[in-house]
Structures are given as structure tokens and as C-alpha cells.
């Protein structure tokens, strides 16, 4: 990917980076471990972005 990105694409990439995190521990404790996985998790090599 090119080094110089337009602002809209950069913002969308940052949103995808923020979504690609694990569920926080306090959320697991608050939901009695019912919520343990993030359905939006994505591997950088296997998953593709639709942007």
C-alpha cells in the first residue's frame, strides 16, 4: 500500500485497527464470561478489508 494515503482511507483504516482488538477483561467479568470473543477480529494475512 502506498505511503501517502488520503484522509478518508486513513480514518477507515484506523477504525479497523481499533476494531481488531480482543474483548477487555472487565467486559468478560461484567457479563459472567458470556462475552469472551470479538466477532470483528481479523488476521492481517487471512482477512481482507472492504475499504
Swiss-Prot record:
Gene3D superfamilies: Ribosomal protein L39e. GO terms for biological process: translation. Pfam families: Ribosomal_L39. It comes from the Archaea. One of its GO terms (cellular component) is ribosome. Keywords: Ribonucleoprotein, Ribosomal protein. InterPro entries: Ribosomal_eL39, Ribosomal_eL39_CS, Ribosomal_eL39_dom_sf. One of its GO terms (molecular function) is structural constituent of ribosome. The keyword Ribosomal protein applies. PROSITE patterns: RIBOSOMAL_L39E. Belongs to the eukaryotic ribosomal protein eL39 family. HAMAP family: Ribosomal_eL39. NCBIfam families: PRK01242.1. This is Large ribosomal subunit protein eL39. The lineage of its organism: Archaea, Methanobacteriati, Thermoplasmatota, Thermoplasmata, Thermoplasmatales. The gene is rpl39e.
Amino acid at each position: 500500500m502506498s505511503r501517502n494515503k488520503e484522509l478518508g482511507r486513513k480514518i477507515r483504516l484506523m477504525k479497523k485497527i481499533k476494531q481488531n482488538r480482543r474483548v477487555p477483561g472487565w467486559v468478560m467479568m461484567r457479563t459472567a464470561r458470556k462475552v469472551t470473543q470479538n466477532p470483528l477480529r481479523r488476521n492481517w494475512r487471512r482477512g481482507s478489508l472492504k475499504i
